[in-house]
């Protein structure tokens, strides 16, 4: 049936009407009386009935429909249920069969015919082919590449972004190759990791803009929507991560505790004291450790290609998603002793703690044990050889948090005769892992065993600016670690 709609409009006489005029009750017109009732279409009291019914419904407050939608799933929703209620101690088989490693090694060292590679990069590719064939030991770049390739072959995606991550700040990666005969600067690139298998996961590598906060913030958000992709943000130097401190504090370290927002984001922060000054030495390990609680993050400082291989694979294969902060090396990228074999990848796994590697060191004769993390291990190793010391052992802590307490206690039992235990670190005493790790170490000690500190003195700056001063500090901390100099800090668990 047709219906008439009547509008009654009261003019407020332009915009400058005094406010007291429109506030007065100007009355209203009962349209129903004018039309419907007079024509016999509706009863005369119909409008009043509708008003009464409306007000009664409003007063009752009854919901006409269930405000909670059931069985609803947004098309953008991500299923995180497979990764809930898991633990960091859950086992993960990160080993890859030797034949598969060799196949992957061949694929990532194959380039298209006629592709002109830069001579220096060509040497890197040829060396990697020799590594895949077992003719050379694996270096850091190859361990990393095989980790990416194997993860991709397993169907997971890999996304790597940062200010210089295609090549790598220290030219160790070369994930993207460039044709030296290209006619245009923006063409002629080839990415071997995009060609490891027919049904592989997606590999993306992005040289980002020079903004740590913006890029890390984006990658954090991306990672919360991609549980099956290894999302990595790499800082040009670990020192520059402080430009994104808000993202680290507000989201990465505490997002799950505050909002239940899970992420498997990985941070690669180049860290190490090589005399490059206060802005290119420290990724501030102490700050990340201070943020750790309730198993909210994983803090790892790997020292071998096998370790970076297994920890990257563990991040995806294990049904456990927490942020992974990797303090990656700089000088170890080409260090002659920071190497691994294909067997280490094919048969091994990630080690929370790496014990003494020299079989000539007799645990029963060891009186002093040095515990450290990162690149300092290789300086200590070289100094021990030079001094021809066989009465001290060197242990590496590869995962700082969550701390492998049982693994460390096993090392303490192994050196039951050792009374002097030393934590040695590159960083100043008020920085680095010292204040965090000493409690874990002391909890494992028996009566009569004491803990000492060997490292740089407390400093407002992360590092000194002169190489000579840097080297003098290094010599002093090694002497302290070996017991040839007075320790800067001493605590004990001796009998009272």
What residue ranges belong to the model's regions?
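Flexible, glycine-rich loop/tail regions that form catalytic "lids" or insertion modules at the edges
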Residues: 2-496
């Amino acid at each position: 049936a047709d219906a008439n709609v009547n509008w009654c409009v009261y003019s407020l006489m332009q915009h400058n009407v005094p406010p007291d005029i429109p506030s007065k009750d100007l009355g209203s017109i009962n349209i129903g009386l004018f039309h419907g009732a007079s024509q016999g279409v509706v009863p005369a009291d119909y409008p009043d009935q509708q008003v009464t019914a409306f007000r009664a419904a409003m007063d009752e407050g009854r919901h006409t429909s269930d405000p909670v939608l059931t069985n609803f799933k947004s098309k953008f929703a991500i299923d995180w249920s497979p990764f809930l209620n898991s633990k960091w101690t859950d086992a993960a088989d990160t080993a890859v069969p030797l034949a598969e490693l060799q196949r992957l090694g061949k694929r990532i060292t194959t380039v298209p015919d006629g592709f002109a590679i830069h001579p220096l990069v060509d040497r890197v590719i040829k060396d990697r082919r020799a590594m895949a064939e077992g003719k050379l030991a694996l270096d850091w770049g190859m361990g990393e590449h095989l980790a990416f390739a194997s993860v991709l072959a397993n169907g997971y995606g890999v996304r790597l972004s940062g200010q210089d991550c295609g090549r790598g700040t220290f030219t160790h990666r070369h994930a993207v190759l460039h044709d030296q005969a290209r006619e245009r600067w923006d063409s002629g690139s080839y990415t071997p990791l995009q060609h490891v298998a027919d049904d592989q996961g997606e590999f993306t590598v992005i040289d980002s803009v020079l903004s740590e906060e913006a890029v890390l913030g984006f990658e954090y958000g991306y990672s919360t929507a991609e549980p099956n992709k290894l999302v990595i943000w790499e800082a040009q130097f670990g020192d520059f991560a402080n430009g994104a401190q808000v993202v680290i504090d507000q989201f990465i370290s505490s997002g799950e505790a505050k909002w239940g927002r899970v992420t498997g984001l990985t941070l690669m922060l180049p860290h190490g004291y090589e005399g490059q000054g206060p802005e290119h030495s420290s990724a501030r390990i102490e700050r990340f450790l201070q943020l750790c609680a309730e198993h909210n993050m994983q803090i790892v400082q790997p020292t071998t290609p096998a370790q970076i291989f297994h920890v990257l694979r563990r991040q995806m294969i294990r049904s456990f998603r927490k942020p992974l902060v990797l303090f990656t090396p700089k000088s170890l990228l080409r260090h002659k002793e920071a190497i691994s074999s294909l067997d280490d990848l094919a048969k091994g796994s990630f080690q929370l703690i790496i014990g003494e590697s020299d079989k000539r060191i007799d645990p029963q004769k060891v009186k002093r044990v040095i515990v450290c993390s990162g690149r300092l291990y290789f300086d200590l190793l070289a100094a021990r050889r030079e001094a021809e010391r066989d009465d001290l052992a060197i242990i590496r802590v590869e995962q700082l948090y969550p701390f492998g307490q049982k693994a460390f206690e096993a090392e303490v039992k192994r050196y039951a005769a050792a009374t002097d235990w030393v934590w040695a670190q590159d960083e100043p005493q008020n920085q680095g892992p010292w204040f965090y790790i000493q409690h874990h170490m002391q909890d494992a000690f028996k009566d009569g065993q004491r803990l000492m500190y060997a490292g740089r003195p407390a400093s407002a700056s992360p590092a000194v600016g002169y190489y000579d001063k840097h080297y003098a500090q290094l010599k002093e901390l090694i002497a302290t670690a070996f017991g040839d100099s007075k320790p800067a800090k001493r605590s004990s668990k001796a009998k009272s």
